[in-house]
């Protein structure tokens, strides 16, 4: 059962850095719906992409799976036999709830839920990889290595879905979309105090990149094609394709 996010509704004397702890995990579904514009659309469209890209006898990786929303969307849309989904997160609280969510939905495609660091996971025989609002929590210097590993582990014709909060090279555009995002959160019932305290906790942990920076990294990793397929304010998702034909 999801609870309403009121974690920051009262003043907090000492704000530390953001962590995906038990308190966050408990309210996460409400929090992300009220904080990330277009989140439900991205989740449902990840399932549509899975229907197009997941191949028989291959694996799908959901790296930074949180409570398993993307994993479940993929699982619902797989049309082939002998596929496997590997869902990974380093938060024990998230993983515990993710396992419950996966177990509650019965489907023929098996899901392995792994508590671990996505940087340590071996990617192999993958037809699809999902990084849904995950890369932004890695140190910028570590992001290229992860994308390189994903590219190498993808089969020809495979796809990476990369969803992120974006920064913008045009400061005027960045300011506009930042303000519109805050309007979105206010419209969803968050107070100025809640918005401010959460932003303070995230500012040293969630470091955003521009779409241009993401595309440059993807090219460097080897992806022959990449494009922004969804955007709402300063949030969006790219798809990157490895050339070749799926076996």
Curated annotation (Swiss-Prot):
Organism in which the protein naturally occurs: Salmonella arizonae (strain ATCC BAA-731 / CDC346-86 / RSK2980)
SUPFAM superfamilies recorded for this chain?
S-adenosyl-L-methionine-dependent methyltransferases
Q: Which family does it belong to?
A: Belongs to the class I-like SAM-binding methyltransferase superfamily. Cx-SAM synthase family.
Q: Which domain of life is it from?
A: Bacteria
- Entry annotated with the keyword tRNA-binding: no
Pfam families per record: Methyltransf_25
Task: Fill in the subunit field for this protein.
Answer: Homodimer.
Record's protein name:
Carboxy-S-adenosyl-L-methionine synthase
Q: What keywords tag this UniProt record? A: S-adenosyl-L-methionine, Transferase
What EC number(s) is this enzyme filed under? 2.1.3.-
Role, per record: Catalyzes the conversion of S-adenosyl-L-methionine (SAM) to carboxy-S-adenosyl-L-methionine (Cx-SAM).
- Describe the reaction catalysed, as an equation: prephenate + S-adenosyl-L-methionine = carboxy-S-adenosyl-L-methionine + 3-phenylpyruvate + H2O
Decide whether keyword S-adenosyl-L-methionine is in the record.
Answer: yes
HAMAP family in the cross-refs = Cx_SAM_synthase
Tell me the Gene Ontology biological-process terms attached to this UniProt entry: tRNA wobble uridine modification
The disulfide bridges present are: none
Supply the source organism's classification.
Bacteria, Pseudomonadati, Pseudomonadota, Gammaproteobacteria, Enterobacterales
**Alphabetized GO MF terms:** carboxyl- or carbamoyltransferase activity; S-adenosyl-L-methionine binding
Q: Which residues bind S-adenosyl-L-methionine?
A: 39, 64-66, 89-90, 117-118, 132, 199
């Amino acid at each position: 059962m999801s609870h309403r996010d009121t974690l920051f509704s009262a003043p907090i004397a000492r704000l530390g850095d953001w962590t995906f702890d038990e308190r966050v995990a408990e309210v996460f579904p409400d929090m992300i719906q009220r904080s990330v514009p277009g989140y439900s659309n991205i989740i449902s469209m990840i399932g549509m992409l899975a229907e197009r890209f997941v191949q028989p006898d291959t694996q799908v990786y959901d790296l930074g799976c949180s409570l398993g929303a993307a994993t479940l969307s993929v699982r619902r849309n797989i049309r082939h036999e002998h596929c496997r989904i590997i869902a990974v997160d380093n938060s024990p609280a998230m993983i515990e709830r993710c396992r419950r969510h996966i177990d509650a939905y019965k489907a023929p495609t098996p899901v392995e839920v792994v508590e671990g660091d996505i940087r340590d996971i071996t990617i192999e025989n993958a037809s699809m990889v999902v990084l849904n609002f995950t890369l932004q929590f890695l140190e910028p210097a570590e992001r290229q290595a992860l994308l390189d590993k994903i590219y190498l582990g993808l089969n020809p014709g495979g796809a990476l879905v990369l969803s992120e909060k974006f920064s913008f090279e045009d400061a005027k555009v960045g300011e506009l979309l930042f303000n519109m995002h805050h309007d979105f959160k206010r419209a969803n019932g968050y107070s100025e105090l809640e918005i401010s305290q959460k932003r303070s906790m995230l500012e040293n942990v969630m470091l955003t990149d521009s779409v241009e920076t993401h595309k440059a990294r993807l090219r460097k990793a080897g992806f022959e094609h990449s494009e922004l397929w969804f955007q709402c304010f300063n949030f969006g998702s790219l798809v990157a394709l490895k050339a070749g034909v799926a076996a």
